[in-house]
């Protein structure tokens, strides 16, 4: 069974984008390439349990085992040594990516307190969109009672679009609630 959001992309978004930007081929229409979820755990240096818990939560949110990220270089001010585990990340592609994006847009973002839409300034100039989430509790898989500490995470949506305008139209078509 194809994902609901993927079907919407193929049936509604592709024709709309082709009409607006006059693409010569369906293959030229921008699409979501991958979604990267990153959770930096700064206090993992002093307490390794925090990193394990963060990785567990990231696995619940994404449905995929996270990769533990390590420090690239030592920074004395942060009491950080090279090679010490300081975070976790997950790269979603294909079906899981569409499922996550659908869940993010339709369930998780509306659960954010005082939510007025995601900022429009978070495009990087190459058609990718970055979104920071302040707490992991907005995701339905996270049980409120099991959370020891609120942690934020970064969500990077990588698209094949060449410009921010194309990328924004793509994400708007997929239901991303941008602030007015």
UniProtKB/Swiss-Prot annotation:
Cited PROSITE patterns: RIBOSOMAL_L5
The name this protein goes by in its record: Large ribosomal subunit protein uL5
GO MF annotation: an example: tRNA binding
UniProt-listed GO biological process terms: translation
Alphabetical UniProt keywords: Ribonucleoprotein, Ribosomal protein, RNA-binding, rRNA-binding, tRNA-binding
Lineage of the species this protein comes from: Bacteria, Bacillati, Bacillota, Bacilli, Lactobacillales
Purpose: This is one of the proteins that bind and probably mediate the attachment of the 5S RNA into the large ribosomal subunit, where it forms part of the central protuberance. In the 70S ribosome it contacts protein S13 of the 30S subunit (bridge B1b), connecting the 2 subunits; this bridge is implicated in subunit movement. Contacts the P site tRNA; the 5S rRNA and some of its associated proteins might help stabilize positioning of ribosome-bound tRNAs.
InterPro entries in alphabetical order: Ribosomal_uL5 (IPR002132), Ribosomal_uL5_bac-type (IPR020930), Ribosomal_uL5_C (IPR031309), Ribosomal_uL5_CS (IPR020929), Ribosomal_uL5_dom_sf (IPR022803), Ribosomal_uL5_N (IPR031310)
Gene3D superfamilies: 3.30.1440.10
Species: Streptococcus gordonii (strain Challis / ATCC 35105 / BCRC 15272 / CH1 / DL1 / V288)
Stored Pfam families: Ribosomal_L5, Ribosomal_L5_C
A Gene Ontology term for the protein's cellular component: ribosome
Known partners and oligomeric status: Part of the 50S ribosomal subunit; part of the 5S rRNA/L5/L18/L25 subcomplex. Contacts the 5S rRNA and the P site tRNA. Forms a bridge to the 30S subunit in the 70S ribosome.
Family: Belongs to the universal ribosomal protein uL5 family.
């Amino acid at each position: 069974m194809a994902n609901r959001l993927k079907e919407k992309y193929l049936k509604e978004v592709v024709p709309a984008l082709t009409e607006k930007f006059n693409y010569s081929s369906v293959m030229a229409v921008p699409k979501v390439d991958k979604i990267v979820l990153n959770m930096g755990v700064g206090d993992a240096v002093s307490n390794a349990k925090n990193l394990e818990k963060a990785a567990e939560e990231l696995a619940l949110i994404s449905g995929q085992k996270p990769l533990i990220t390590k420090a690239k270089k030592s920074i004395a001010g942060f009491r950080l040594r090279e090679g010490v585990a300081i975070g976790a990340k997950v790269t979603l592609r294909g079906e899981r990516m569409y499922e996550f994006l659908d869940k993010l847009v339709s369930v998780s973002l509306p659960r954010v307190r005082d939510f007025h839409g995601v900022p429009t300034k978070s495009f990087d100039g190459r058609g990718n969109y970055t979104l920071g989430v302040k707490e992991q509790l907005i995701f339905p898989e996270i049980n409120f009672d099991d959370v020891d500490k609120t942690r934020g995470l970064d969500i990077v949506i990588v698209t094949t679009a060449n410009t921010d305008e194309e990328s924004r139209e793509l994400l708007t078509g997929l239901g991303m609630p941008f602030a007015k």
